[in-house]
Amino acid sequence: MERLSTVRYQRLQVLARADRDAYEAIQWLQKNRGVFEKCVYDPVLVMVDMTRPEAARAIETCLSWPVQRTFVCQTRADYDLFTHELIDKRQWRLNVVEMEGAQPLESYTPPLPEAELRALGFDAYALQCIDAPTDVLRYLCSAAHLHAIPIAFEGRVNPEHMERQRQIRRYISGDTIFTTTFSNYGQRRPQTMSRVLKPLRNLAHVGDMAERERATASLRALQAL
C-alpha cells in the first residue's frame, strides 16, 4: 500500500534509516487510527507536499530535523493517548505536538503583501510553496515561520535594500539564506548573516501532484474497506 505513493514510500525510508522510533510509530499508527478522536498526522516529512518543487531545498533548510520528524495531533486527548502508548509505554523517542487551542492558520499573516514582495525580487513565501493538512501548516507557521520567509528563486534580492526595509528578518535568495538582526540600542543598526542552503536530501522526492492526489484517493478507498 505504501508504494501507491512513491513520495511517501521514499520519505518513509528516510525515517526508517534516520529515526527508527518515528518509523515504527508510523506503522503502529497505521494499525490503530481508529482509537483516536481525529486524524493524528504522520511526521511533517511525510505529510508535506511540494507545490513548487524548485523550493524543496529552501524548505528543507527552513525545517530542522526535529520539526521534520514531528507528529501532529489535532486534540489534547489524542496527544495524551498517543504519547502514553508510544512514549510512556514503549519508551520511543518521538516529537509530538497538539494543536488544540492553537491560533488559526489565517492569523499567520505575511509581513508584506504579494505585490510589495514581488517588487523586492521575491517569488513567493515559503508557505505558498507547500501543501499539507491545515493543522500541519499551523504547526509549521508556529515552529518554522514559513508564512514570513520569502523566497527568490533566481537570487535577485539586494541584501542592503532588505536591511533598510526592516520588515523581513529572514529570507532566501538563490542558494543562500539571509538572517538580519538589529541592535537593541541607539539607531538599531542591522547586521545580516548568510549561509548556503543545505543540500537537498529528505525532500528530494517531490513527485507529481496529480499522481500524489490519485495515490491519496486510492489509499483512502482502501482504508474505507
List where the protein language model places each region.
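Low-complexity, highly charged intrinsically disordered N-terminal segments
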Residues: M1-Y9
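Hinge-like oligomerization/junction regions that interrupt long coiled-coil arms in large cytoskeletal
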Residues: Y9, Q13-R214
